[in-house]
C-alpha cells in the first residue's frame, strides 16, 4: 500500500482544454485554489463514486481498480483507487495545480482535526512532503501531501 501511495504521490496529471462550467464542484476562480472534499465513503463501489462525482469529467474509468476525474478548468484532478479483495474504495488522490500548499494543509487540518507534519527526510529542494493521521468517514486514515512549485498532491488512504 505504501508503495502505491509513494508512486501516486510522485505522479502529477496535466491536461489541456476543458469547459468553464461554473456548476462543477471544486472549480477555482482564476488565480486561486479551492479545497475539494472527495468521496470518503471507504469500501464503496465505483458506481457510488461515479454518482458522487457526477459534476466532474470522467477522464479514465476503464477498469475496476481506478477512476480519474478532472474539474472543468483542469485545475484539480481526483483519482479513486479500489484495492483489496473486495475492490472497495481504499485510496483517494487529489492533485491541485497550485503552489499554495499552506492553504490546502490548513483546510485539511481544520476539517479533519489533524496535524500534518513536514517530513524532512522525504523533502528536497522544491519538493516538500507532509504526513498525518486522522479519522474521516469513521475510518482511521493516513494523509500524505506532496508539494512542488506547481502542484499540491494529497493522498488519503485507509491503512487496512
Question: Predicted regions span which residues?
Answer:
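Short Gly/Thr-rich strand-loop-strand
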Residues: 110-134
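Bacterial N-terminal signal peptides that target proteins for export
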Residues: 1-2
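Short helix/turn-capping signatures at newly exposed starts of structured segments
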Residues: 16-117, 156-160
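C-terminal motif of bacterial Sec signal peptides marking the signal peptidase cleavage site
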Residues: 11-15
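Short, exposed beta-strand-loop hairpins at the edges of beta-sheets
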Residues: 131-150
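Short, low-complexity, Pro/Ser/Thr/Gly-rich segments in the mature regions of secreted, periplasmic
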Residues: 146-160
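Short amphipathic beta-strand and strand-loop transition segments with alternating hydrophobic
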Residues: 79-81, 118-120, 140-146
Amino acid at each position: 500500500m505504501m508503495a502505491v501511495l509513494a508512486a501516486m504521490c510522485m505522479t502529477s496529471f496535466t491536461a489541456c482544454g476543458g469547459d468553464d462550467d461554473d456548476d462543477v464542484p471544486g472549480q477555482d476562480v482564476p488565480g486561486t485554489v479551492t479545497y475539494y472534499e472527495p468521496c470518503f465513503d471507504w469500501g464503496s463501489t465505483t458506481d457510488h463514486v461515479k454518482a458522487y462525482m457526477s459534476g466532474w469529467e470522467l477522464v479514465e474509468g476503464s477498469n475496476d481498480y481506478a477512476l480519474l476525474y478532472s474539474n472543468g478548468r483542469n485545475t484539480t484532478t481526483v483519482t479513486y483507487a479500489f484495492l483489496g479483495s473486495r475492490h472497495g474504495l481504499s485510496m483517494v488522490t487529489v492533485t491541485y495545480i497550485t503552489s499554495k500548499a499552506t492553504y490546502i494543509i490548513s483546510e485539511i487540518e481544520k476539517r479533519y482535526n489533524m496535524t500534518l507534519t513536514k517530513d524532512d527526510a522525504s523533502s528536497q529542494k522544491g519538493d516538500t512532503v507532509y504526513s498525518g493521521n486522522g479519522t474521516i468517514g469513521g475510518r482511521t486514515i493516513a494523509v500524505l501531501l506532496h508539494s512542488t512549485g506547481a502542484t499540491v498532491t494529497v493522498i488519503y488512504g485507509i491503512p487496512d
